[in-house]
Amino acid sequence: MLDIKFIRENTEAVKANLVNRHNDFDLDEVIELDRKRRELLQMTEALKSERNAETKKIALAKKNKEDASAAISAMREVGTKIAAIDKELAGVELILQDRLLRIPNMTDASVPVGKDDSENPEVRRWGEIRKFPFPAKEHYELGENLGILDSERAGKVSGARFYFYLSMAARLERAVYNFMLDVHTQQNDFTEVIPPYIINGASMQGTGQLPKFEDDMYKVEGENMYMTPTAEVPLTNYFSGEILDGAVLPVHLTALTPCFRKEAGSAGKDTRGLIRQHQFHKVEMVKYCKPEDSWDELESLTAEAEKILQLLKLPYHVVCLCTGDIGFSSAKTYDIEVWMPGQQKYREISSCSNCLDFQARRANIRFRRHQRDKPEFVHTLNGSGLAVGRTVAAIMENYQQEDGTIVVPDVLRSYMNGLEIIGKRESFVSSKGE
């Protein structure tokens, strides 16, 4: 959330940021609400001073045994006015708070201005794209041919955008996320967390999912609770409402969770395969740090996500999201996109973002540099490390062989009892009813 004082003093810059983000939010309404709020505060303060003066008159009159009825009447009239203004003020503040929660973060000056993902500049690339001596298949075709991915039966059980992982696909998924967690906790100095998967509305608001993105989340019927869309939410809210000792910063947390998303607005996109599912695993990384350290932390966070792909020997490139593509809460984001031979293009597998104090203001997360210092807002960062299903898909496509089998990457073999090749699964014996 942006500070209202910052908005008041930098109105044109905030408007320009909205234009660059292609966001049609009406900032003038916020400016008017802020003006009205300050006007009402001044009115009520003036009336309270008047009421205090009348109270003193009443006390003096009673002390002198004089008639205080006029002063009492005047005080009651002032009290009625104060109550009316306070009621109006509460209404204005409620609307103002709602509008402030809908304003996106300010993008950093280094973020390129652009309309959409087609204008995200490449920052760097890594790895050599393999040249196949045969037509490369997409992962879902490979998985279905091997009998280890089943969308048909998942559709019967749950609907579109779900999969059953069977046998070695399930083992591969498990190997991938255990490998990721081991790298982050043993090499990258993250603390592993198992967070709640059902999250309250206040926490969703803290990270910026609410109120803007409610339509893309699964809500628990009859409750202000949601299925987690990403571990960013519980990990970032771990310290909500707290003041940290600056000596503990930075704090680095990582978690594997299932993620649940409606994928609203994705009709017709990636209707087959593991790229865009309603339910998927993701290893998330979240950092809390002092303001002066957050840009260095963004670079290290991105490198930590890249390290997973490098160890898996999967080619990728890094792009910087432009103003028209960057997320609501982010000041700057790097997307890591892995090469998918079956699709002949790069696909997003991680987003690494510096949110500055935007989320910390919403969730009220602060720190003190020293015991007597005034609390400051921390800076928060988050990044996928990585999306597990997309990593499995990338492994299947990049490590496929002409006969449709899949070579297990070297670093994963110890997680799969030394298995080197994923071959065809023997089908279940089944009989279909009439």
Question: Which residue stretches match the model-derived regions?
Answer:
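N-terminal alpha-helical targeting/anchoring segments
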Residues: M1-I129, E144, I148
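TRNA-recognition modules of translation machinery and tRNA-sensing kinases, especially anticodon-binding
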Residues: R125-E434
